Amino acid sequence: MILIPVFNDWKSVFKLIENIDSHINNEIIDIVIINDASTESFDNNQKQFSKINSVKIINLIKNGGHRKAIATGLKYCQENLDYDYIIPMDGDGEDRPEELIDFFNQVHETQPEVITATRVKRSEGFVFKFLYSIHKIFTHLITGKLIKFGNYTCLSKSAVSKLLTDGSVWLSYSGAVTKHFPQFSTIQSIRGKRYFGPSKMSIFALILHSLRISTVFKENIFIRVVIIILIFGLLAYYSSAYFLIPSLAGWVFLFFIICLALDDDIKKLNNCLNNIKSLSDIYSR
């Protein structure tokens, strides 16, 4: 099963599904689109595919962003649908359908709980690549976890059940996967180019993404940041008041972590299906 969140990008999603249809062979693939309260409609003409088994849409009432849409999709699929593995992927073309075969091959060979798509090449410009590298380094330093993947993963049914045992997946998908599965299989992935329009990932969104991942490991972060604050506080006391600047920055960082941690809430995750407005079956073989 493939899970695709979408907000006002129907043209890209249906192009992706057409490409998925052309890249799968004997696999039985059902696709679930999570419509994150899109304000734009899509062409409702009956879609036809040669290999895909079915396509359905879960329409949400309120927009919550891709991470909450994916969490809602996982929760719905776990409680209502039959599947062996589920693959969340972005609907804009940046997660390449050509790499699905690599997921399928690993599933058939070793039946791992989790497979992640490790980025070995990105398609963005130099500035974004540089900032993304800073994000990975910062996350690694502050959490002790080196996260090289995004939403594009392959999860067994047991892995989905484990992810849904706490609220961390409501906060950060990649952070939650890393938290629950320290060891996982990987495939190599090249970041594709968007089918239509510019990337929606701004610098601010990247910073927020980094902070959310960090918040998943808030207990570890709290200890590390408090130690750093104390060290710079002592340096400020015995050496120079300028050392108060990084100490204050540490307190500000902890404040943001505490605020973001409010989304790490199992109650919100357990109640997320109340945000489903309707279900639509748009294709079935």
Feature names for model-found ranges:
Residues 9-23:
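Short, well-formed alpha-helical segments that are part of the catalytic scaffolds
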Residues 8, 36-38, 64:
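Conserved short acidic donor-positioning loop in nucleotide-sugar-dependent glycosyltransferases
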Residues 1-5, 59:
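Short hydrophobic beta-strand elements that form part
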Residues 35-44, 93-94:
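A conserved acidic beta->alpha catalytic loop
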Residues 61-62, 66-76, 85-88, 94-171, ...:
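Acceptor/aglycone-binding surface of glycosyltransferases and processive sugar-polymer synthases
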Residues 107, 161-220:
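Catalytic donor/gating beta->alpha subdomain of glycosyltransferases that bind UDP-sugars
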Residues 222-285:
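Membrane-embedded multi-pass helical conduit in multi-pass membrane proteins
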Residues 28-38, 58-60:
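Short beta-strand/loop segment that forms part of the nucleotide-sugar
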